[in-house]
Design a protein with these regions (language model features):
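Short, well-structured N-terminal submotif of metal-dependent ribonuclease cores
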Residues: 1-44, 56-69
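Phosphate- and divalent-cation-binding pockets in alpha/beta enzyme and binding domains
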Residues: 28, 48, 90, 127-128
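Alpha-helix capping/helix-boundary segments
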Residues: 15-16, 45-46, 87, 107, ...
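Active-site neighborhoods of divalent-metal-dependent phosphate/nucleic-acid chemistry enzymes
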Residues: 3, 76-119
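Acidic active-site catalytic centers that drive phospho-/nucleotidyl reactions
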Residues: 12, 104, 122
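Short glycine/serine- and small hydrophobic-enriched flexible loop segments
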Residues: 51-58, 112-113
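A general alpha-helix detector
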Residues: 48-52, 70-73, 90
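Acidic, PIN/NYN-like endoribonuclease modules and their adjacent C-terminal/linker elements
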Residues: 1-8, 108-134
Length: 134
């Protein structure tokens, strides 16, 4: 899929994890993050990344040593973390409208509020973004 560069980018946890795993999408995702003027994320993103790191470590795909460093690198990708409480009302409305979980709609709410591109590896969330983002 071709992505349009944006001055503002909302980064979701799935994209961060793909970059850490060196997936086929990693280079494209990194380029979009580097070229964005501002990278934003809801507060939840770091918790979701931490949970993904735990799962990868638990499955034997990552060593325990270095997990904190990986989480720190995830945090360093973002210029501004938006508190979830500032997004919850809009995320709930989107969740009800789209029939999609509130925690994922936090990303959509932030992207919509900031007129930003959503960078995600979640194909369903990306499809929903086309319905609600400019």
């Amino acid at each position: 899929m071709t992505r349009v560069r944006s001055s503002k980018l909302v980064l979701d946890a799935s994209a961060v994890v793909r970059m850490m795993e060196e997936s086929p999408q990693a280079a494209e995702f990194r380029e979009l993050v580097i070229t964005a003027e501002v990278v934003l994320a809801p507060e939840l993103m770091l918790t979701e990344v931490a949970n993904a790191l735990w799962r990868l470590q638990r499955a034997g795909q990552l060593e325990l040593e270095g997990l904190h460093q990986r989480l720190s690198k995830a945090s360093d990708l973002v210029d501004h973390i938006e508190p979830d409480r500032h997004l919850q009302v809009e995320a709930l409305a989107l969740a009800c409208h789209l029939d999609y979980p509130v925690h994922d709609c936090l990303y959509l709410a932030l992207a919509r509020r900031e007129a930003a591109m959503l960078l995600t590896a979640d194909q369903r969330l990306e499809k929903l973004a086309t319905l609600v983002l400019p």
